[in-house]
Amino acid sequence: MSQVKSSYSYDAPSDFINFSSLDDEGDTQNIDSWFEEKANLENKLLGKSGTGGLFQGKTPLRKANLQQAIVTPLKPVDNTYYKEAEKENLVEQSIPSNACSSLEVEAAISRKTPAQPQRRSLRLSAQKDLKQKEKHNVKMKAKRCATPVIIDEILPSKKMKVSNKKKPEEEGSAHRDTSEKNASSPEKAKGRHTVPCMPPAKQKVLKSTEEQELEKSMKMQQEVVEMRKKNEEFKKLALAGIGQPVKKSVSQVTKSIDFHFRTDERIKQHPKNQEEYKEVNFTSELRKHPSSPARVTKGCTVVKPFNLSQGKKRTFDETVSTYVPLAQQVEDFHKRTPNRYHLRSKKDDINLLPSKSSVTKIGRDPQTPVLQTKYRARPVTCKSTAELEAEELEKLQQYKFKARELDPRILEGGPILPKKPPVKPPTEPIGFDLEIEKRIQERESKKKSEDEHFEFHSRPCPTKILEDVVGVPEKKVLPITVPKSPAFALKNRIRMPTEEDEEEDEPVVIKAQPVPHYGVPFKPQIPEARTVEICPFSFDSRDKERQLQKEKKIKELQKGEVPKFKALPLPHFDTINLPEKKVKNVTQIEPFCLETDRGGALKAQTWKHQLEEELRQQKEAACFKARPNTVISQEPFVPKKEKKSVAVQEPFQLATEKRAKERQELEKRMAEVEAQKAQQLEEARQQEEEQKKEELARLRRELVHKANPIRKYQGLEIKSSDQPLTVPVSPKFSTRFHC
């Protein structure tokens, strides 16, 4: 951790060096004599006081030999830092500054108080308080060590040059301060040795960023005011005209400007945290700055227009530019090589250098202006009237009029009537060919065939009836039953169902579908239109009903009579009543009745019923029952005769006549338009010829050279300079005077 080092005062002996004598050229050899004597004296004093061992083996002018102040730690709570600093100041005030024993006292104090680590606060407010406290300590110590010192004896800072010239105001103020101090404390001046004070460069007041910004803004305002004045003068000269002589501005005497260090503008670091000063050889660093640039010969002044304030509203010429579609822009961007890949030509570099040839020469030859009107807007897509008329002409030329042949009846003069249509014969009625009549005829022919005479023909008797029994089925040989022991001992014996319990399954009667009657037309049953009532989908009503039923059931159970306890009578133990013993009958052998035999008989029976039903339906379908004939009683169909009026002759207009009139009007209009165009072209040609003649006359007038008179200017008055000659002073290369 870095330790906080307070500023210290230097106890110098009574015999001090006069720095004004160092400016003499003859004393340059013994410049370092005073510093060597000073270092030897300090080593002697420290050796006597017992601290000489600390400084052995070190050069006398090292910074390590300098005295270190007492370290006080920083604490965030309470103002302990300020209290410790005040105690330190009191201790320093009690000890005289010129006493050599002060080193011993401070060494003893530093031994007693152990070095504590510094606690650095990162807050800006704490840093500002620290800076103010340090400034206050520096001022207090500067007052204590203030002695009657001549200003010429103050050591120069590292950045300032040693110069004999000083402002009279500063000298006067310095003399006043020294005289006042000498008058107020004559006794102190006698007792104390004269000590060189701190140089003024170290007592700089640090400015805040706000003050620096204000200074910058003030400077900028002053520059703007000066520029305005110059512009006004230049404007007056320009308005006065070219013929008047231009007044040259008289060069003023150089004004002395105070030093302005750029380091003051930077944000300063804490003085305790700055890096140690590195010693640099002054002679090696000399003449490293760049050489002064050669003066460039200025050419003639080129008159430039005033950059006055103008409106920011864009005009039509500025806004409108060549229209390039977005697709074309994208394609150009991908095809274009970036500028950074293009090689620069040497001509561009040559043009950058200032030269007399770069001044533009005003040409006297007339030149046509390079107008950019064709690039202002996008190309016009709509066609002009001239183009439209040309297209119409082409269409008219392409269209060929073809006249129809003349009808000779028009010239005859008689009325042209339409041809009469041919007379159609009257409708002949045709009788209806009904299907019923055909069926009646077919039925009569069938009846005649049925009435034919029946003759009996005997058939031969089958021999099988005589040989064997026919129609009785053979008796099936049943298998012998195998006896099995009855399973009485089994607990989980499955009892076979008795025949009484078994319900006889009725055989499923398969009904054949009726044969459709193809004579009757099919009429589908139209479903009845029912309006569906929209009900809300909810379970609330159902839940409520269920809850009501539940409550009703609970009430009924509650209303029911409470069962009364009735004790059973005691049994009679005298007689033992046992159930009668049931004697089971012996199993009798019965023939087996298989389900397969029963199923086959049922199937044969159902098949027989189906055949009978089909035959009956076929017979019913064969019998046709005709509907009564109502056509005979109705009136026959008679077509109605149309009652058309006689055709009346109407006036008519031929399309050829109409087209001929329109054609004549069009030709007349076309001839008028052509005549107007020819007249306009003739007028335009005449105007153009007149303009050319006027332009030639104007150019001839302008080309006649008129020489300007020779201008007369005031003679130059050469004035001798009032400034004194520069006195050469040898430079002070030694860095020892820089504190």
Swiss-Prot record:
Heme among keywords: no
Gene Ontology terms describing biological process: apoptotic process; cell division; mitotic spindle assembly; regulation of mitotic spindle organization
Localization annotation: Nucleus; Cytoplasm, Cytoskeleton, Spindle; Cytoplasm, Cytoskeleton, Spindle pole
Main location: nucleus
Glycyl lysine isopeptide (Lys-Gly) (interchain with G-Cter in SUMO2) cross-link, chain position(s): K476, K640, K732
Pro residues composition-biased segments: 418-428
GO MF terms, alphabetically ordered: importin-alpha family protein binding
Record field: compositional bias (Basic and acidic residues): 126-137, 166-180, 207-218
Modified residues (N6-acetyllysine): K128, K304, K374
Cystine bridges: none
Binding partners and assembly: Interacts with AURKA. Interacts with importin-alpha; leading to inactivate TPX2. Interacts with HNRNPU; this interaction recruits HNRNPU to spindle microtubules (MTs). Interacts with BCL2L10. Interacts with KIF11.
Role of this protein: Spindle assembly factor required for normal assembly of mitotic spindles. Required for normal assembly of microtubules during apoptosis. Required for chromatin and/or kinetochore dependent microtubule nucleation. Mediates AURKA localization to spindle microtubules. Activates AURKA by promoting its autophosphorylation at 'Thr-288' and protects this residue against dephosphorylation. TPX2 is inactivated upon binding to importin-alpha.
Family: Belongs to the TPX2 family.
Protein name: Targeting protein for Xklp2
Organism: Pongo abelii
Gene for this chain: TPX2
